[in-house]
Amino acid sequence: VNSTYIGYAPIDDPK
């Protein structure tokens, strides 16, 4: 998956 961290959590992740 494309885990683009936006400061705290990756966009592709529900967390």
Swiss-Prot record:
Protein name (record): Putative penicillin-binding protein
Similarity-based family: Belongs to the transpeptidase family.
